[in-house]
Each structure stands twice: as C-alpha cells, then as structure tokens.
Amino acid sequence: MSNSFEILMNQLGMPAEMRQAPALAQANIERVVVHKISKVWEFHFVFSNILPIEIFLELKKGLSEEFSKTGNKAVFEIKARSQEFSNQLLQSYYREAFSEGPCASQGFKSLYQNLQVRAEGNQLFIEGSEAIDKEHFKKNHLPNLAKQLEKFGFPTFNCQVEKNDVLTQEQEEAFHAENEQIVQAANEEALRAMEQLEQMAPPPAEEKPVFDFQAKKAAAKPKLDKAEITPMIEVTTEENRLVFEGVVFDVEQKVTRTGRVLINFKMTDYTSSFSMQKWVKNEEEAQKFDLIKKNSWLRVRGNVEMNNFTRDLTMNVQDLQEVVHYERKDLMPEGERRVEFHAHTNMSTMDALPEVEEIVATAAKWGHKAVAITDHGNVQSFPHGYKAAKKAGIQLIYGIEANIVEDRVPIVYNEVEMDLSEATYVVFDVETTGLSAIYNDLIQVAASKMYKGNVIAEFDEFINPGHPLSAFTTELTGITDDHVKNAKPLEQVLQEFQEFCKDTVLVAHNATFDVGFMNANYERHDLPKISQPVIDTLEFARNLYPEYKRHGLGPLTKRFGVALEHHHMANYDAEATGRLLFIFIKEVAEKHGVTDLARLNIDLISPDSYKKARIKHATIYVKNQVGLKNIFKLVSLSNTKYFEGVSRIPRTVLDAHREGLILGSACSEGEVFDVVVSQGVDAAVEVAKYYDFIEVMPPAIYAPLIAKEQVKDMEELQTIIKSLIEVGDRLGKPVLATGNVHYIEPEEEIYREIIVRSLGQGAMINRTIGHGEHAQPAPLPKAHFRTTNEMLDEFAFLGEELARKLVIENTNALAEIFEPVEVVKGDLYTPFIDKAEETVAELTYKKAFEIYGNPLPDIVDLRIEKELTSILGNGFAVIYLASQMLVQRSNERGYLVGSRGSVGSSFVATMIGITEVNPLSPHYVCGQCQYSEFITDGSYGSGFDMPHKDCPNCGHKLSKNGQDIPFETFLGFDGDKVPDIDLNFSGEDQPSAHLDVRDIFGEEYAFRAGTVGTVAAKTAYGFVKGYERDYGKFYRDAEVERLAQGAAGVKRTTGQHPGGIVVIPNYMDVYDFTPVQYPADDVTAEWQTTHFNFHDIDENVLKLDVLGHDDPTMIRKLQDLSGIDPNKIPMDDEGVMALFSGTDVLGVTPEQIGTPTGMLGIPEFGTNFVRGMVDETHPTTFAELLQLSGLSHGTDVWLGNAQDLIKQGIADLSTVIGCRDDIMVYLMHAGLEPKMAFTIMERVRKGLWLKISEEERNGYIEAMKANKVPEWYIESCGKIKYMFPKAHAAAYVMMALRVAYFKVHHPIYYYCAYFSIRAKAFDIKTMGAGLEAIKRRMEEISEKRKNNEASNVEIDLYTTLEIVNEMWERGFKFGKLDLYRSQATEFLIDGDTLIPPFVAMDGLGENVAKQLVRAREEGEFLSKTELRKRGGLSSTLVEKMDEMGILGNMPEDNQLSLFDELF
C-alpha cells in the first residue's frame, strides 16, 4: 500500500481489518484530477486484483461521505494488474453497474439489472428474454455497461444478449399478471368511487339504500351479452374494455414452469382479425375455457395493448362467452329447394376454394336433393365427391367446365374458286362503341379497295350513334364526338358500303367480329347479309406463320415493316391489313404453291389449328356409367393430345364421345352467351341447338362485364338474361339458373381475390381496366353458394313465376335424369400374368428346398402354407411376381435392390427374391446339408446376433438368419390387405426399372402415379403479403394468418410420385379407373400420369413403388471398386460393430473427428439425431440396431418415451418398444392371443391407443397385466403416434452395415464411393488444403449455423467436410482437379489420394463435365481458347481452373486455334 493511499484510508476512517485486507496490500493512487468548477475529485486507483465487492462498496461509501462534508463529490476508477475474476464476482459488479451513471436509466435498469451474466474471454453474455434483445439497447446502452465494468477494473467487454425462451415466457407471464392486478385494482377503485357517490346522494323517498358489492360490481361492468361490440377493423391503437365478437381460427395452450396456463388464440369478425391472450392459474382451471376452440363463436372483453414480444396489438381477455352464430339457411319449404348445377371446388386450378366435401355438406345441410360439380378442365374432385355424397346421402352430379375449340377455323368464308393474284379486295375495318352488335353501335367504317397490291379506291365514313361517346371508346379508337356529330345516317353508310364492296373479296383482321357486326346492322336495316368471300387475315397469319407467338395486327405490321400510324382507327387499320394481305398471298404461293382462294382452307389450315382457336366454355355432365368413361376419355385427350396452354376439347372429339353426357351452355365465356350479346337471339338459337340446356346466372355473377364496359349497365344485363331465356324457350330446351359457385360463404370472397390476383396481370382474369395509376383488374363476381331464397331474390326482376321455374323447377327436373354412377370401384383389379399363382408357389418352394431341405422343417412349411393361402387366395400373386421380375432384372444389370416398408414380413417375398429380410424366428441353417435349428423363445431379437456354430451333422459352419417378424404386419391378421410392395432400386437403375414395368405390362397399361399440388401455407402467406403490397392494403399479423389459412389448399399444379407406377389390368383400360394427363402439364414428359391423385384409386389398381435410392448405388460402386460380393459381407463383423461404440477401429480419436463414434457417413446412423441416440445407448447387436432404426423413425417413440426409460434405468435398448412388429411378438411371447396382440399393435402404431374407447383400451390393459406385461410398457404404448416396420428397419440396417464394412476394412473405396454418390456440396480448394484448412472452414460454418446464417449449401458442405476431415485424419488425402485424369462425375483413386471429378468444381454441371471428358479424348488442349471451345467451358470456369493451377502453363491462344477462329 502506498503512503498516499494509506493516508487516504486513514482520512476516510476505513476499518483496520479492511485496510489490512490482501486486496489492498499493493494499492496505489495513480493520479487525482480535481475539477474546481464542478467540485469533483476524480481518483485513479491501481490494485493487484479486482476488489472484493464488499471492499469496493466500503471504499465508495467512505469517499462519498467524506467529500460531501465539504460540498465536494468524489468518483474513482480502478485498474487491476491481474484481471482474473469469478462469475460470482462478475455478477456482483454487474448489479452494481446500474447504481449510478448512464446505466442507471430506469428503462435499461428495470430490464437488465437482475439478469444472469457470464464471461467467455472478452465476451460478456447477458441471459434474458426476447424483449431485451433490441437494437436500441445494443446501440445505446450495452456500450455504457461495458465502460462501467471497465471502471471497476474488468477488461473491455463486448456485451451480447443470449436469448432464453423460459425467461421470455416468464417475463410475459409476469407482465400480464401485473397487468391483471392493475386492471382489478382499477375496477375496485371505480366501485369504491361509485359507492362513495351513492352515499353522498339523497336517499330514495320510500326505500332505504341497499349496498350490494356484487351488484355494484355488475353495474360497473355491463353484462357481456349486452355490451356494445366493436368491429375489429376499427381498432388501430391501444384501448381498454373493448368487446369483440367473432370466430376462433387458431388456438394454442402453453404451460409455464410455474404451472400457469397461457391460452393464445386468434379470432376474426371478417372485418379484421385479432390475437387474444387469456392467463389462467393452472391446467385444471384451463379446462373451464374449453369453449375456446377452433370454429367456435365467442364474445370477448378485454384490453387491447401492444404486445412487446409480437409487436402487434393483442387483447388481454378478461371475460368471454360462447355465442350463437347465425348461419345461412335455405328458407324455402322442403320440396321447393333448388339444385346447384355449376359449382367449382378447390381442384379448379388457382380459382376456387371449397373442398368438394364442403359443397356436398352444404347442399345436404340446406336440404338440396342434389348438387353438381364443374371444375375447370379436370375431374380431380370426383373420387372425394363420390365418397362424400354417399356419406351425406345426397345425389352428386359429376361435371366439368370444359374448354371447347373448333377443330379447323376457316381462313376463308363463302369460298369460291378464284385466282388470288387477280382478285379485287376490299380490306375493311370497323370501329364500334363495344363488342356487341346488338347493344353497341358502329361509329366508323373504313375500307381500302385493292388490286395487285395497289389501293384503287377508299371508303371512310363516321356514324353518329346518337349519344356521346364514352371516354373508354375515345381513348381506344381516337374517335371523338366531333368526328361523328355531322356524320351520315347509319343506313346510308351501310348502303354505300355494300355498293363499294360489289364483286370483291372482303378482307378483315379477325373477320368474325367485323363481319358479325356488319351483318347484324344489315339485317336490322333489311339489307342483305354478306355473301361474297371473306378472308380473315388473323387466321391466314396463324396458319402461314404458326411459329409466331402473336398474330395481332400490331405485332404483324411491326414484323413486316408495314406502317400503322393510328391503331384502332378503322382507315389506318384497313390499309395496314391490306398491305399484309398481299405479303401473305405472295408467301403462300411461293412456300405452299397455293394460288386459288378456294384452296386456302384445304391446303393451308394446319391440323393443329385448334391450338390457336378461341376457347369457349361448356359444362359437361355425366348422365350414366357410359358417360363417366367418356368424360374420362375427354379429360385425358384434352390434357394430353390436345393440350396447348390449357386443356382443349375440339368439337369433333366431343361429338365422338357425347354418349351418356349432358351439355350446358356455361357462363359468360360460353358461346351461347357470346352470340346472344354479339349477334342477337336469332344467331344464338342456331348455336344453342348444340346444347341440352341453357344456363343463366345471377346478375351479380355477370356484373364485372359492366366494369369492363362490355355491358352498359344492370338494365342491359337483365335484358341479356331475358334473351338467353328466350333462346331456350324457342328451342324447347330447359333454362337453369346456376350460381357459378367458387366459395361457400360471402365473406370468403377475399380468399379467392388473393388467389386470383397472385396470378399476376398476365392472367386474363387480371387484365386491367383504366390506365396509369388508375389501372385495376375488373372486380371479381360475388360467387358464393346461394340458397334457394337468395337465388330467387337475384332473379326477382323476371317475376316470381319465371324465377321459380328457372331456380327450382327446371333444376330439380333435370337432376332426375341422372343415373347413379360408380366413380371409384369397390374391388381391387390386379393385372394378369399367365400362371402367376403357379410361378410364385414354384419359386417359393424351389428356394425354400434349396435352403432348408426337402421335406421342409415344420416351422418353414407352415409359414409358407399360411402365406401362400393369403397371397394366392386373394389374387395377390401377380403383385408378388411383378415385383420379383423387376428385382431380378435389376439384379441381372448388376444392382442390389433394397426393400422398404413391411414387405420383409413376408417369407414368400424372401424366397422369391423380393426382399433379403428373412422374417422367420432366429435360426441356424447349414448350407451343406440343410440342417436347421430355430430359436422360438424370444431370447434373440435377430438371428445375426446368435453365436457362431458348426453343423452337428456335417461340421460345416452354420449360417445365421431370421428377424422374427410376423406375416400379419404385412397383409393384416386375415391376410387380405392389399400388399404395398416398395422397392429401393439404385438411382442409376431406376429409369430402367420403370421401363421394365412398361415392358412387362404394356405401355397402355402402365402410368406414373399422379399427384395434385395445392397452395401450401407458406405460399399462401406470400400471396397475402403480395396482395397487401400490390393493392395498398395493410393487415395486422393475425389477419394475415387468417387470410393465408383461407387461401391455402387450392390446386396449383399436378405432379407424379417419385417412383410409383400404377398398373391397369390388361382386361380393362385406364378409363375404367381414371383419366390420364402429363405431370405439371408438361407435354414433353416421357410418362403420362393418372389424372386422379393415386391415393384415390390405390385400393382398385396395383401400384408398384419403384423408388430410387443411394444405398444400392453405393453398394454397386463399392463392388466395382473392390470386387467383393456384397451378399457375402457378414452382418456380425466385429470391426463394423465397433464403430457404434468408439473410433478406435478407424485408428483415430473422437477429438480428431469431432464425434465419439464412427457413425459419420453411415446410412441410417450418420445424422446428428441418430448419432446422439447411439452415444446414449451404445448398441452392440444387430437387434439393437433395428431398435435404433425404429426409434429414430417413429413419432413419440424415442423422445419423451424410450429415451426416458433408458435414462431412468427402467428398461434398456433391447427391451423398449422400437418397431411396430416388436409389440405383437413381445405380447405373444408374454402369453396374449395372436389376434389381440395384433390388434394392440395396430392401435399403438397408428397413434390410436388414447383415441379408442376407454372400455376397449381397458380390456387390452387387463389382458396385458394378466400376462405380467410391465406397467412402463403399457404407458409407453399410450405415448406412441407412429411406428416403423421392423422389416423396413432390417432392410435399411443390412444395407448400412455393408457400407460400414467398407469404411472399416477398405476405407479408400468407401470414401471414393461416398464422395461420388452421397456428398451434395464440395469445396475442392479446402478439401485439398489439409486438416488445418478443413477444420477452419468447418468452424466458420459452425459459427454461422449457431447464428442461423448458414446457407443450405454451407450446411451440406459441412456434412461433406466432416467426412473429408475423417478421411484426412485416417491418413488419406485429396488431390487437385486434373485436366487429363479427373472423371466427369466420380472421384478417382490414386493410391491413398482421391482425385476429384469436374462436377466438384463450383459452377461446372454434369453435362459440361461430360463434354469436357469427351473433348480431351479427342486430343490435348493446346490453349485456353481451345479448351473453352472444345470443352464447352465458360471464360469464368477457365479462369477458375487457371487460378487453381489446373491448367499449368497453358497459353491463352496458339497459332492453330487462331487459324481455326479465322477460317
């Protein structure tokens, strides 16, 4: 202690024992700074160590008290020569840091002072809730905290927050508990105030006051059912004592460590949505709030506050009650309710919302006797609709809204023989006020009379429509009121134009519109309709230039350099069209030899002109079973042969398959509606003759046409509907009022809006109206499922009698003509293979005799007999034989095939070669004399674990096998369950195996199993946020979640099962079961798929799972490298089993490879999760490995179940429940009847143990207890949600052990195969740079993973580097890429070194790698330029190669390559 410091201690009166403390022995005052103006003395002390907190506080107190006596203030800073400290000392000083200075701010102090801290080097970790981890604190407060600790003598810290979920929850809980107390106190204060007011008031004249506290409390808090309800959308800030009413759409309960329960739920009133919170004391009290459940309607009261954790407004609920919500009902009497004939399900791609089950249930609830489904272009809702209708007891009418096209759209109308080069043409164009020749007006007719390409006369007249032109018309055409105000009368213009056109060929672009408009006006003025030839240059161009994507007038004139100054003014359009005509005439003569007008339709129209034809909608319905097959054929043809952008049905194709079908005229996109609007009733009558009934829809459905200015107003719309009715009446065809349903409830409209708008402005439905910032898509129609009374209201303008006829009478009458149909068959229809039963039996016994001798041991004979009885008796032999043929073919190509699923439970499958898993009891068998010995007492879980033994008969070493798996787990207890045989082919051989299926059964009977992809929850969330952005909306989080839920589940695309192939029996055809299509509408795909999701028909047809897997590919690669037959690798190799207990067998330590066992890169056991299980359980036998495999794949089998039992010492790895089959086997060994043991296994494996009735469950428990099954086993059963089949586990473990064998005994082969086949990401620079670089890169990625900053590629790379590190530690190396030795895709062994392939280089794909290898076989690369050219490499890749030293001294160019470039 220095003299100056000792003097200071005396002056401060510090206790003697403290002055003598070791901490102050070498104390010194470094300097003192006196601030005279502020009267602050600043001491700088130096101590040997950081002071104990008690001495520090005493020193601080002494200085403060002594200097305050003279009106001064003393502060001090400390330097410690040694900065060693304990976390306990740090914690003490951490709290002290908040006592004064900048850290003493109340907000910072209240959140941080009581938290736990720890130091690691210069990092100070503060453990706290999510609320404290804010940018504000990091930026403004944590640096001050570091400075304050530095003044106490600590090193300079970098302060970081370490989030703790438990603290987050506790802080939230404490906040709400305190908040509830404040609210309660406020209510009680209000009550006391009311009581005081009442006491001050004069008493009633005849009655004494009664003070009832509960009554006053009720008065202060109005009853919830009488409280005023606030719409959620009106609440944008914090408010107290609000009442909401709405439906719950999400609910979750959390139990805190203290036992309190937080009920989080979300509600919507369809104006917006809100998050709610309700805290209750414990789980028992939480049961009182079971009314908070999904889809329940509640009225809630509470305070709306900003939640500090979600950063969104949240209601803290004080009280709530269930309310009765009014549901829409069909109010018409029974027998007077409608039938909906036009309803879309969520299978209408990106267009409609309800599942077919919802439509059926709604119709049934409303008492409708039938309902029809009409999805766009597909029938994928049929199977689910079929089952739903049977369940609901309602008639379902099966339909489709199809896209009908004309097969051949004419180029020439009214054609005659005429030399194209000698004809005189009138090329004309009209401008109108709209698209309807009936409801809109001609405002300009212009034409150019042309001969041999020259204009010889012109016609151009405006016409006054008799009303001001709309802004839309003027904007589109450039024609103003001034243009037309002094124009000639329409009739005069028409007469003059007819005279102008005499003896000519008329020409127009999209002539059907112009000719239709002119004919309608001619007819209206009693003038003859057009009869001379008409050329449509739109169709002329489409057939002459099919390769062009666009054939509009604008794109064509631009392409051919024809001037078009004012598009949409008739005179300019006409002349431009004429110039194009003569280009086409010249082209068609030169390229196609067509010179005669009459030959254009014959010689030029393409067979696939339907691809460009205008689509018209029609509804097609299945009348009977013949119709069902025909609609399947139509859907198939439209989605395969005639698919172009969308599914299309050419009219002639529809005609050929029309038997058993009923046709409706569909919506505003149908041709009847179109012709009624554009050409009038007479023309529409001719078109409507094709249909069986006419559809009319509510005006609200057609209303978007008004917004698009295609229809003038609602009055005109009603006139169009009346015209449609007239069409039906004139033809004697029924007219039906249909609803074009796209969702069930009116409030669901927003979900469809979000889905449709997500398609973007390129979609026709989203084409904008208006311009610039005012451009918006037309509104969508109100397309909810309407009740009868709602439909009658929509058609009230027709009068009650007519409305009832359309809505009720006609729909019910038409429903009567539809017959019941069988959409999904009730039986399994397996394909036919000649002598399948005999072959399966023959193959089975042949192999069994070969292994077990003849006669067979009883246990083998009985098992075969039992299985064959089920297999052959239920028609499953063909399934077994087909699988056997596929496996045999792959084996012959040199690949092993692994089984998956429970097929290994079948001994017949083992004998005929479908699976290598032997399901018999553990047993020995002699390969020399067929002696066998079976162990049936359960003492061994696997035959591979039995000790080695020699044959007592011949002394030959016995082989060991048998996994003890009952057959019942494959085909059910009665052996009649359809077998699901899944096979793992090598990924390399899978395409060949698929083609084998076609070869065996025929191309017309084998199809890939189809799938339907719907909008996922995350995608729907993206759609909502996109809608928010694009349409200027703002939704709180709860509303976004609600909207995303509503938008999810809509069909988005189709696909195919990765390996599933559906086989149709050759005595039927595919249309007996399903239509077909291409996956994702890819008409270039090699395979067609089932149109139905394969799950919908999997009980009717055979599905073969021909899957691709890496394991067989690995085994094949290892066999090729080593020459070792994988079938001869033992399953009980000591070295292999040693991998599961340590790393010694690899010659490395756990520290070297970062894991305590040798599991890295071993299939099934190499993941972090399973490696952790291995570390905990230390398996030593094959049976225990099976257990691990089952435990790792099951749900709630390991975590919270077997893991706890093993940790607590109640059971071990061999006795816990691992695989589903173990339950049946264990219970039978315990003494239960096989049937009951099987049933218990089925209940447990499907997670049904706690869902079955208490009576049933108790029966099983009593039986188990009676047979001394331990209590822990029974409890374990109750926790399981899903279990893995033992046969699947056995097949996977056998493959894994083969791979592991090479890792132990032939490591260089193993690493070569692993990196060639399994590794997903490479960093060849790091991989070849040695251990230090590898470990450093792993550490970098590991750090990123901790902070959730690692990319998927980096995560994959980390897995690769783990194996790379292990390989280097074992003494092997990676070489550099070698331009002349590296392979395209596979690693190359060079002694103890692996040379990487070209695909391991970042950015170099497989195709380029193969091209590079082919190029080098042609000769050496003489320059980088040649390498780029011949090798197909980009400049960037060549530069990378050069940087990596792969190219050596290769020059940039050479004389030869320069010569090649020049010539």
Curated annotation (Swiss-Prot):
NCBIfam families: dnaq (TIGR00573), polC_Gram_pos (TIGR01405), PRK00448.1 (NF001688). It comes from the Bacteria. One of its GO terms (molecular function) is DNA binding. The gene is polC. Belongs to the DNA polymerase type-C family. PolC subfamily. It catalyses: DNA(n) + a 2'-deoxyribonucleoside 5'-triphosphate = DNA(n+1) + diphosphate. Its EC number is 2.7.7.7. It is found in: Cytoplasm. HAMAP family: DNApol_PolC (MF_00356). This is DNA polymerase III PolC-type. InterPro entries: DNA_pol3_alpha_NTPase_dom, DNA_pol3_finger, DNA_PolC-like_N_II, DNA_PolC-type_N_I, DnaE2/DnaE/PolC, DNAPol_HHH, DnaQ, Exonuclease_RNaseT/DNA_pol3. One of its GO terms (biological process) is DNA-templated DNA replication. Keywords: Cytoplasm, DNA replication, DNA-directed DNA polymerase, Exonuclease, Hydrolase, Nuclease, Nucleotidyltransferase, Transferase. CDD domains: DEDDh, PHP_PolIIIA_POLC, polC_OBF. The keyword rRNA processing does not apply. Required for replicative DNA synthesis. This DNA polymerase also exhibits 3' to 5' exonuclease activity. One of its GO terms (cellular component) is cytoplasm.
